[in-house]
Amino acid sequence: MKEKTYEGTKKTQNGLKRMVFSALAILLQAVFMVYMFTRLNEYAAAINATTSVLAIMLVLGLYNREQTASMTTPWIILILAFPIMGVSLYLLVGLNGAPHKMRARFEEVDSMLLPCLPENADILSDMYEKVPQATGISTYLAKNAFYPVYQNTDVTYYDQASKGLEAQLSDLSKARKFIFMEYHAIEDKESWHRIQQVLTERVQAGVEVRVFYDDMGSIFFIDRDFSEKMEKLGIKCRVFNPVAPAFNMFLNNRDHRKITVIDGKIAYTGGYNLANEYFNVTHPYGIWKDTGIRLEGAAVKSFTIAFLEMWNASERKVPREVDVSQYLLHYDYEAKQSGYIQPYADSPLDNVQVGEDVYISMANKAQRYCWFITPYLIITDEMSHALTLAAKRGVDVRIITPGIPDKKPIYSVTRSFYNQLVKHGVRIFEWTPGFCHAKMSVADDIMATCGTINLDYRSLYHHFENGCFMADCEVVHEIRDDFIRLFTESAEVTEKYRTGRSARRRLGQSIMRLFAGLL
């Protein structure tokens, strides 16, 4: 036991060293840039003039940018108030700029993979006849995210991540052709060891196994040579966007997706990563609430493509052709459930905020109720307006947030959004047993979504994410029932935030809110 504790501590220390070293190196680059601006006194006039012109150009560019004001306003204020520092920081971290080569790489991969998905226009037409209230969202996803809607798919809902893990292990052990796993965080401890054992057995049985994880998300959980260890076991392994001590504009864009695909027949997604705390093996923040879903049937194709997009785009050189036919084989399956299932993915490399648009659309389409659960509540003006407008229309809008935070500064920002929502009729509940990490929404007993997308700027604008929109199916009622249970375990904070706040608190929260888009 002591040896395991020591190994875990060592991994955390190694990850911390990597993170601190990289952060210091990047900070030094930023400091050096500011230093060069300020110390060249003999060129002060020219530097000030150049900085002023550049600041004006950047502000005008930001003002005319096709982006929410919540994202651009903090930069405009920072650049105008402190031109040298503001311009320097914006050029370093504010351009939302994955390098052109990276964008081109993803566009090239998408051009090869997305056409492999069926259009399913007939299903969309059928959906319009049966559930017109949800059809607009599915049409949006099909035409803008390029992920179609499906039928003939069974969905199983897991109200606890541990239940999802057990089902996942069972399905993994039965894999015959391939296993794809993509996660934001993997922790090299008991929960992962159970998965690794099954994956190793499947490799020995001739199954192709691929594992893909985000370096930043896993940096405190695994050793740097984790991918090499997997390769030695016969598991193909890749790391997304490795943390490096050199400045990289793409560093802020992380892979937050959570996908498992088995033989192209079964897929899993949800809020949980592959680490002990998600399964309540450890309890750093009280009870951990997470959820997941299992798909079996036609809709699995979309998650297969979503995985292959990230896998192939992460190669240094994109192959001229990507043959996915062996992973999209047709097989006879007759679903026991009815309904419409639509997996989708979101990318920060385009100007389409798929995750936010789905949430806003659900609030706009809701007629009776629209409920959300999220670990963080740091939203744009557009999202806030959609929620409050729905409440003003008489829709029962509720949001569940954690009772115990995992990041106290971010929790303070989350709470700073309460007042503007509750005074317009949105009800907010804090889940008192611990930390809720689930990311879901359900509306009117008709539609729901479950996936990886938090109600915060990072998920909605900066990360690669995924979700699954579901309409007119049994799982919607199961998700609704879980929400009802959660409300009974939560403390409503609405009344407290309807009353006035102290001037000090208002000032502090205003500052946090102003720069929330930069978090």
Predicted regions and their residues:
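N-terminal localization/anchoring segments of enzymes in phospholipid and broader phosphate metabolism
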Residues: M1-D357, S361, P405, N419-K423, ...
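Acidic, glycine-rich loop-and-beta core segments that form the ion-binding/anion-interacting portion
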Residues: Y333-S338, D346, Q353-P375, D381-K392, ...
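A C-terminal junction/extension of Radical SAM enzymes
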Residues: L421, I428-F429
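Glycine- and other small-residue-rich loops at beta-strand/loop junctions that grip anionic moieties
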Residues: H184, P375-Y376, I410
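Catalytic-core elements of nucleic-acid end-processing and repair enzymes
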Residues: K439
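Thr-Gly-centered strand-to-loop micro-motif
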Residues: I373-T374, T401, W431, C450-G451
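Extended hydrophobic/aromatic segments used for targeting, binding, or gating
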Residues: E382-H385, L389-A391, D396-K423
